[in-house]
């Protein structure tokens, strides 16, 4: 679990590692002006689970630093904004996959939520997004009622552009999905769950 990032000269074939810490470094993205590289990784503490963070360095591997954000979540799928002032990323928060962005000094914000999975038969979270040079984003959109569609947006907006399950929903009615939280009897921690009620459920019956 100790991967490094390399620079490869495609003419000579020479390559050089530009990271060297004890821990994984992966998913490099070069800034649009070609001066910086953003990447994901963490210092390996040999634990069963560790969260990936965003790091930035110069193109030659110098001046590495971690972007310190007030966000206790695992980060994935990074993109530079068109002007290289922000980095967009993906993360999961309480069962919902979101797109966020941060400045290079860690000023973080949530851009949009309801990033959905890739299976049209199941409303799983996860999924992917991409970012254009003018900061418009496209992503796999999904809710409990509309799994595996596509959406696009700009500056926090979102517009669904597909309706892949329309032929099914024309004659099927879904039950209402409710999020619930309850306290563990073992250690008092809060546990998240969901209730799916039958279609046309009447609480009085």
For every predicted segment, state its role.
Residues 1-6, 17-26, 38-55, 66-76, ...:
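A flexible loop/linker signature enriched in serine peptidases of the S9 family
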Residues 1, 90, 110-204:
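Non-catalytic accessory segments flanking enzyme active sites
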Residues 32-33, 82-83, 131-133:
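Residue-level detector of Asp-centered blade-edge/turn motifs that repeat once per structural unit
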Residues 9-13, 58-62, 103-107, 154-156:
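Short loop/turn segments that connect beta-strands within beta-propeller blades
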Residues 27, 77-79, 128:
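Conserved beta-strand position repeated once per blade in WD40 beta-propeller domains
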Residues 14-18, 36, 65-67, 98, ...:
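Conserved beta-strand positions that form and line the central face of beta-propeller blades
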Residues 34-37, 86-87, 137-138:
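Hydrophobic beta-strand positions that form the internal "hydrophobic ladder"
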